Amino acid sequence: DDARADAKVPRREKGRARVAALLEAAGAEFAEKGFDAATMTSIAARAGASIGSLYQFFPTKDVLANALLEAYLATLIGDFERLREEAPALDAAALAHRLAPALVAFRAAHPAFAPLVETPGRSLPAAAGVRQRFRREIAAVLSAKAPGMKTAQALVYAAVVQQLMKAAIAIQGETSFTHRAAVIDELERVMASYLETVLGGR
């Protein structure tokens, strides 16, 4: 599989800066045009780099897309890890306030994320098991808040939270609906009530 080939990891600061610029350009191209329509030539041009420089670090578009998705996932997982550390000090409402809009905000900040994860007929290695991985991260946050919770139960609760987060994404995608923010606030309220129930006021 082309996407499983290795991207070249630069050793020098200049090389790392170049790779960061190439990934940023790739994100803009994928978000604007979609995976299939974006080309290595257009990505290099947007980055102000030569096509040879792009191929030096990323031999195929699949490798480039997979590297970008891995970077996005590392950022998102880092966000969950920070929330896990803070969870014991948060009540249900504060926890819901952090969780309910989290993926909406992340996708807005990284618009190429959805096309890379959801491209029909194409599955990047980094996209494998993404939903299950998010569910485990949510479960870890809930377990940090309620240390005595069994793993299986945490995963059930996490799946409910995940569905509410997906509902927030769905309503945010209805751009013709002018009350999207109000609906997301209501979803947060529903999540807070649910967390208050399942966490038992912990």
Regions found by a protein language model. Give the residues of each.
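Alpha-helical DNA-contacting segments of helix-turn-helix folds
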Residues: S42, A65-Y72, A127-V130, F134
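Amphipathic alpha-helical segments used for helix-helix packing
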Residues: R84, P101-P125, A139, A167-E174
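Pre-recognition alpha-helix immediately N-terminal to the DNA-recognition helix
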Residues: A21-E29, T75, R98, A102
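Helix-turn-helix
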Residues: A21, A25, E29-V63
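Amphipathic alpha-helical packing segments from all-alpha helical-bundle domains
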Residues: I77-G78, A94-A109, S123-G148, L155-A159, ...
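Amphipathic alpha-helical linker/stalk segments
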Residues: L68-L95
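N-terminal intrinsically disordered/low-complexity leader segments
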Residues: D1-A17, L199-R202
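Amphipathic C-terminal alpha-helical segment
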Residues: F113, A140, A144, Q162-R180, ...
